Amino acid sequence: MSTWRKRLATAGLSVALVAGGIWVLNRLDEAPLPHAERVTTTASLDIARGRYLARAGNCLACHTRQGGVAFAGGRGIETPFGVIYAPNLTPDRETGIGARSASEFWRALHNGRSRDGRLLSPAFPYPSYTRITREDSDAIFA
């Protein structure tokens, strides 16, 4: 086999290994969500605590575009990977997270996974948010 064919074969194998590695890493930590019903009534203390945590975490900074409705998303954030648009975090069932469960919110916040299991990178999981407890995540979701 000639030298250029060996190099081509090595390059092809390298690309295949990298692609396979990326695929495997994308599937790690993809545990199924528990089947839990969405809580329809929430204690006012949880709502107040969630409001406090959302403000302390500065969620408005990314999830509110200039002059827009609080937490309604749409703000474009320049990154080395291109512009990322923050999603709507309002309780609206069609455009926000109102149709989501607390478990789905936790999975996005803590594990950086979408409702269907896709990675939300490069934005999530945001390193400091992986330390948020499930209890705090549920309060923010409330």
Language-model segments: residues:
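Electrostatic cytochrome c docking/interface patches
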Residues: 31-55, 99
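N-terminal/domain-start segments enriched in small and hydrophobic, helix-friendly residues
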Residues: 22-40, 94, 110, 121, ...
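N-terminal type II signal-anchor transmembrane helix
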Residues: 2-34
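C-terminal capping alpha-helices of c-type cytochrome domains
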Residues: 21-24, 101-115, 128-142
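Aromatic/His-enriched, Gly/Pro-containing loop or helix-boundary segments
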Residues: 39-42, 91-97, 101-111
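Gly/Gly-Pro-rich "capping" loops immediately C-terminal to redox-active cysteine motifs
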Residues: 66-102, 117-134
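The canonical Cys-X-X-Cys-His
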Residues: 50, 56-66, 105, 140
